[in-house]
Amino acid sequence: MPLVTTKEMFRKAYDGGYAIGAFNVNNMEIVQGITEAAREVRAPMILQVSKGARAYANHTYLVKLVEAAVIECPEIPIALHLDHGPDFETCKSCIDGGFTSVMIDASSKPFAENIEITRKVVEYAHDHGVVVEAELGALAGIEDDVQVSRSEERRVGKECRSRWS
């Protein structure tokens, strides 16, 4: 079974009433461990790659590790996802490099700019059969290089969410 999209996975999970684990990976041992566990329980999985993992382990090596997991476990649905891609170029690189899902996280930008970047990623991704997740608001907490306080938190309202559903 080749890599699958998260759209396919989520549809089956919703219909079957189960959740799907998403695991950040950055080396062979992590990919092997997660893959072996998924095989044992016959569970689909999302293998995620962060900006930091791409810097640490190299994009090509990570893609090849996930391709090896697909070969070793042909019975397990596996999606390859970019976690918190900071810009269009990173998302494009992952789409062109074989990822089946990307997350654009331009939440550190002004809202209107975030929307435009997200729109550009969505158009490019959909032209290539890739699913997109987007962080349009900003939740309190720390993730990678971004720290958002409670007072800076921006949640996206219903009217905006309905435009993207």
What are the residue ranges of the model-derived segments?
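Active-site cofactor/substrate anionic-group-binding motifs, chiefly glycine-
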Residues: 40-95
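N-terminal amphipathic alpha-helix/helix-capping segment at the start of soluble metabolic enzymes
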Residues: 1-21
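Active-site beta-loop-alpha junctions enriched in small/polar residues
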Residues: 25-28, 50-52, 83-87, 107-109, ...
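Active-site-adjacent beta->alpha loops and helix N-cap segments on the catalytic face
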Residues: 32, 56-63, 86-93, 107-130
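Glycine-rich tight-turn/loop motif centered on a GG-T
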Residues: 18-19, 48-59, 99-117, 144-152
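Hydrophobic faces of well-ordered beta-strands that scaffold small-molecule active sites
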Residues: 20-24, 45-49, 78-84, 102-104, ...
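Conserved small/polar residues in nucleotide/adenosyl-binding loops
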Residues: 153-160
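Short, well-ordered coil/turn segments that N-cap beta-strands
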Residues: 16-19, 41-45, 74-78, 98-100, ...
